């Protein structure tokens, strides 16, 4: 087993903190941070900000200048070895005279997948991997799932009362949770490559399903400038072609993909609206594969009980995020999700609680499927 020093951990943690700064802007690329250290001092550091812009290693090398020669590089993901929008980072480290590279994890991207480490090794540079691997995985869980399985990382968001209700019997649901929880939802949307909902939700609430910087938590506004705002793709299941160009969805100039089993005439819709056509059978799984092909890393789901239950039933939910408000709505109010195929308690899906956080008066619970 490889042994790393406490100093190695400190510098890699700094690289991870830098990588996290790119979580709102890098999609479809991974979020990566890099720290260059010489004689125990940081001589250069940086993170990848946006696709097409310099990678983290290049930013750190530019800051270090001549001091990069003889330095150790701490990078949160294996340096790339291929020519894309930017030159290979492994080559940049070699040319700068870096003598050692420590990577938090190997890159599963088939274009990299060990090739970066091999390029470094072939050049005589000592390279090791798997320092603070779990933290590195968490930062890029969407990118990593897409690389490994060809599908996005699916986060299902639900908001409910203490008695597990999401809306009154009439459908009234604004607002179950408080302003702080809704602000947190804006933050989660901002991290996502795409949002998934249904025409039923759109018709009932006429939501914009966009990211609103003014509603961000105050601490996020200081690190994520308004001019950097990136709107996620809105993916809407619309089997009966009920979505119309007058919906608020289309007031935000960001792609809208309408999903159904039959084509429709999009006359009158803005040019950023398009259709995705699938047969009804296995529509959700086929949609996930298609979203993976379209480089969607993380999919944030805001929908009603039907789609929520269908995603859970199909085992497509990677993370279940529940906001619980300190309210009681009674047994006539609407339930959390529909699971019509579930008839035995022994068959109920089990979930592992990973995080519990108080947000204002509400509680945020984050679960992952147990045993997966």
UniProtKB/Swiss-Prot annotation:
Binds 1 zinc ion. It catalyses: 2,5-diamino-6-hydroxy-4-(5-phosphoribosylamino)-pyrimidine + H2O + H(+) = 5-amino-6-(5-phospho-D-ribosylamino)uracil + NH4(+); 5-amino-6-(5-phospho-D-ribitylamino)uracil + NADP(+) = 5-amino-6-(5-phospho-D-ribosylamino)uracil + NADPH + H(+). NADP(+) binds at residues 159, 166-169, 175, 201, 205, 239, 304-310. It comes from the Bacteria. The keyword NADP applies. The keyword Transport does not apply. Zn(2+) binds at residues 55, 80, 89. Its EC number is 3.5.4.26, 1.1.1.193. GO terms for biological process: riboflavin biosynthetic process. Residues 1-150 are annotated as: Deaminase. CDD domains: Riboflavin_deaminase-reductase. PROSITE patterns: CYT_DCMP_DEAMINASES_1, CYT_DCMP_DEAMINASES_2. InterPro entries: APOBEC/CMP_deaminase_Zn-bd, CMP_dCMP_dom, Cytidine_deaminase-like, DHFR-like_dom_sf, Eubact_RibD, RibD_C, RibDG_C, Riboflavin_Biosynth_HTPR. It holds the Pfam family dCMP_cyt_deam_1. In the N-terminal section; belongs to the cytidine and deoxycytidylate deaminase family. In the C-terminal section; belongs to the HTP reductase family. PANTHER family: 2,5-DIAMINO-6-RIBOSYLAMINO-4(3H)-PYRIMIDINONE 5'-PHOSPHATE REDUCTASE, DIHYDROFOLATE REDUCTASE FAMILY PROTEIN (AFU_ORTHOLOGUE AFUA_8G06820). Converts 2,5-diamino-6-(ribosylamino)-4(3h)-pyrimidinone 5'-phosphate into 5-amino-6-(ribosylamino)-2,4(1h,3h)-pyrimidinedione 5'-phosphate. This is Riboflavin biosynthesis protein RibD. It comes from Haemophilus influenzae (strain ATCC 51907 / DSM 11121 / KW20 / Rd).
